[in-house]
Regions:
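Active-site nucleotide/adenylate-binding loops and adjacent lid/helix of ATP-dependent enzymes
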Residues: 2-138
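ATP-dependent carboxylate activation and anion-phosphoryl transfer catalytic cores
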Residues: 55-56, 104-107, 115-121, 126-226
Length: 226
């Protein structure tokens, strides 16, 4: 079974556009653009790599931009590094939704809603909860066919990422209301030590470090069942 994005890249060459987050954002009609193209409206934006098959929010950050202040600078790569893009910022819940194909339509069957430690760190979640989905897929996403599953991440009900694999499979057996506390290296979790602990999918810690591109290293999860 396909478990990682790099495996999906090889398995589904016809859908490689999904990994291009700028292309996906444009198809969804968002206000977005690549590095060197200045914004037109003042506001909050998410800045992140156009491609990130590793996941974990590498390089993603929130930034306020104003064309009258930052527009000219953006043309010369200030604020948006090479290989990155900008997109309008969406407030609201961050959800990870797993789908399975039924009668040629993707049907959601498991949803996790996450909370970040703060608005400036888009990697470090402090809690995930099994919830109901808040999403309607555009018709063209139903045309995608995978081995079995599709995972879609949203913020405020807006699609921000599509993965040609499952995303929540380690937690499928838990009911709505179950809370999951990510365990980050160097943080004291004494208050949760009485709860069941789930290790990361990969036992090797280095597989969650991105060769130094991640400063927050997840070790696993504590599960607080409903």
């Amino acid at each position: 079974m396909i478990e990682e994005d790099y495996e999906a890249w090889e398995a589904y060459p016809q859908y490689r556009w999904v990994f291009n987050k700028l292309e996906l954002s444009m198809r969804l009609g968002y206000d977005c653009g690549p590095a060197c193209v200045p914004i037109k409206n003042a506001g909050n934006y998410i800045i992140r790599p156009t491609y990130n098959l590793y996941g974990m929010g590498i390089g993603a950050h929130k930034k306020f931009l104003d064309p009258s202040i930052h527009g000219e600078e953006m043309i010369h790569h200030k604020h948006i590094p090479p290989g990155y893009f900008w997109c309008e910022w969406f407030d609201g819940n961050h959800q990870s939704v797993d789908f399975i194909k039924d009668n040629n339509h993707w049907v959601p069957f498991h949803t996790m809603t996450g909370k970040h430690e703060d608005k400036h760190n888009l990697t470090k979640f402090i809690e995930w909860e099994v919830t109901e989905p808040e999403i309607t897929l555009p018709d063209w996403l139903h045309d995608i066919t995978t081995e079995k599953y599709l995972n879609v991440e949203t913020r405020g009900g807006k699609i921000i990422e599509v993965h040609l694999r499952s995303g929540n499979d380690m937690l499928w057996d838990h009911d709505v209301g179950t809370k999951v506390i990510p365990v980050w290296k160097g943080v004291n979790y004494k208050e949760y030590e009485h709860l069941p602990f789930i290790k990361n999918f990969h036992p090797e810690e280095h597989k969650y470090e991105a060769d130094g591109n991640l400063s927050d290293i997840r070790l696993g999860y504590y599960v607080n069942k409903k």
